[in-house]
């Protein structure tokens, strides 16, 4: 069994299921509202745990009811939450998600306590692999990259400027096709593998500009694509660490 540490976000997702995603300036009034635990870090940790790994989450939440609700599935799933810190002066992160019948979504995140996971409070555990993403301060990701000696996966989402040291240190970088376009040629600084997901078309893995793998998923009827990328990130990391 592999041990997977995840440094990342914990959110409470407010999901509005709509018949059609609104256009800019448009209001839709037919939504059905649901609440779910979420956050890229939480999603990745839970996925790794469900895939048979021993997962530990390092994160920050608020001292509020949303924090309890956001961690329910993690607790039930057996994820080690000893690295989750509660902060008094910021609320738990909230993600507002609109989902269309096709499964496509629009997401807006209010990070709240996720911003409190700064390098000075960071404790990087011993693990076979570490997964990071960018819903926590990028300085924290850089600090983790410097101090962690094992397999490092960095999900460069949401897209933003990152130090070249992160690109050079990561054994695996994961982006979707939109993020890959945003980063452009800067990804050429990466020394490890780059996995680019292209939705229903699958994913390509490259290294040093050369394609080394391609996976095309089976056709299914999409219900909700929320957290699909997070699940892929966890699954690929677990598979590579365990030599699958």
Task: Describe these PLM feature segments.
Residues 111-117, 153-159, 215-217:
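Short gly/ser/thr-rich secondary-structure transition/capping motifs
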Residues 3-5, 128-129, 172, 193:
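Structural motif
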Residues 1-4, 185-244:
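Conserved phosphate-binding/catalytic region of the ribokinase-like
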Residues 1-60, 65-72, 222:
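Glycine-rich phosphate/adenosyl-contacting loop at the front of the ribokinase-like
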Residues 99, 176, 204-208:
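Short beta-strand-to-turn element immediately C-terminal to the catalytic PLP-Schiff-base lysine
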């Amino acid at each position: 069994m592999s041990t997977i540490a995840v440094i990342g976000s914990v959110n409470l997702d407010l999901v509005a299921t709509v018949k059609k995603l609104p256009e800019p300036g448009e209001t839709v009034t037919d939504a059905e509202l649901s609440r779910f635990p979420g956050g890229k870090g939480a999603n990745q940790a839970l996925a790794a745990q469900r895939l048979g790994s021993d997962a530990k989450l390092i994160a920050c939440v608020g001292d509020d009811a949303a924090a309890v609700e956001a961690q329910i599935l993690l607790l039930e799933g057996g994820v080690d939450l000893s690295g989750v810190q509660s902060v008094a002066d910021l609320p738990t992160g909230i993600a507002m998600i609109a989902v269309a019948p096709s499964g496509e979504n629009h997401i807006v995140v209010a990070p709240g306590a996720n911003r409190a996971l700064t390098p000075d409070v960071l404790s990087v555990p011993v693990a076979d692999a570490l997964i990071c993403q960018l819903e926590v301060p990028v300085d924290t990701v850089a600090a983790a990259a410097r101090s962690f000696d094992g397999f490092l996966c960095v999900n460069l989402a949401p897209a933003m400027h990152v130090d070249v040291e992160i690109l050079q240190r990561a054994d695996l970088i994961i982006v979707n096709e939109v993020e890959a376009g945003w980063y452009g040629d800067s990804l050429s600084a990466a020394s490890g593998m780059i996995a680019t997901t292209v939705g229903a078309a699958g994913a390509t893995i490259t290294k040093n500009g050369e394609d080394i793998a391609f996976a095309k998923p089976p056709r299914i009827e999409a219900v909700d694509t929320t957290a699909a990328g997070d699940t892929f990130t966890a699954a690929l990391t677990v598979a590579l660490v365990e030599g699958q």
